[in-house]
From Swiss-Prot:
This is Long chronological lifespan protein 1. A lipid is attached at residue 81 (GPI-anchor amidated serine). It is found in: Cell membrane. Its main location: membrane. Disruption phenotype: Leads to long chronological lifespan. The gene is LCL1. It comes from Saccharomyces cerevisiae (strain ATCC 204508 / S288c).
Amino acid sequence: MKNAALCEALPLLATCSHEIPPTPHTVCFVFPPALLLSPSKLTLLNSRRVASRCVIIIDPRLLRLFSCSRPQQLPRDKNQSFAKPSFSFFFFLLTSLLSPF
């Protein structure tokens, strides 16, 4: 997604729920990208707003790929400006962007 770079310098709040309402200072990303075609989801996205956190909104049908069942705050690394997501997230992101929907 073209606005994924906004997450690079932000604390990452990963969630396995699509029910967390976005705030005016939240950038939301919906996976898989096919969900972007849903008009009800388009209101959750704003790539031009400066964000204080990054919320990952994941399709509940994909929860079997993740071990979490509720939102979790990833710990900050002292040497990084943001906490790194797990390898499984990067693998999921890569496969989501490369696979046709």
